[in-house]
């Protein structure tokens, strides 16, 4: 699931993913966060 959060590194996405999908799992792709539910 892509969320509307800009990123430069995957670690920036973990707190955002935790807030969005309840799980701190994801990575930075093309400058945006992708979360794994």
From Swiss-Prot:
It comes from the Eukaryota. Residues 26-33 are annotated as: Interaction with Ca(2+)-activated K(+) channels. GO terms for cellular component: extracellular region. The record marks 27 as: Basic residue of the functional dyad. GO terms for biological process: envenomation resulting in negative regulation of voltage-gated potassium channel activity in another organism. It is found in: Secreted. It holds the Pfam family Toxin_2. This is Potassium channel toxin alpha-KTx 4.4. Belongs to the short scorpion toxin superfamily. Potassium channel inhibitor family. Alpha-KTx 04 subfamily. InterPro entries: Scorpion_toxin-like_sf (IPR036574), Scorpion_toxinS_K_inh (IPR001947). Its main location: secreted. Disulfide bonds join 7-28, 13-33, 17-35. The lineage of its organism: Eukaryota, Metazoa, Ecdysozoa, Arthropoda, Chelicerata. The keyword Iron does not apply. Expressed by the venom gland. The record marks 36 as: Aromatic residue of the functional dyad. GO terms for molecular function: potassium channel inhibitor activity; toxin activity. Has the structural arrangement of an alpha-helix connected to antiparallel beta-sheets by disulfide bonds (CS-alpha/beta).
């Amino acid at each position: 699931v892509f969320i509307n959060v800009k990123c430069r590194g995957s670690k920036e996405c973990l707190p955002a993913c935790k807030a969005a999908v309840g799980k701190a799992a994801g990575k930075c792709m093309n400058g945006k966060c992708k979360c794994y539910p």
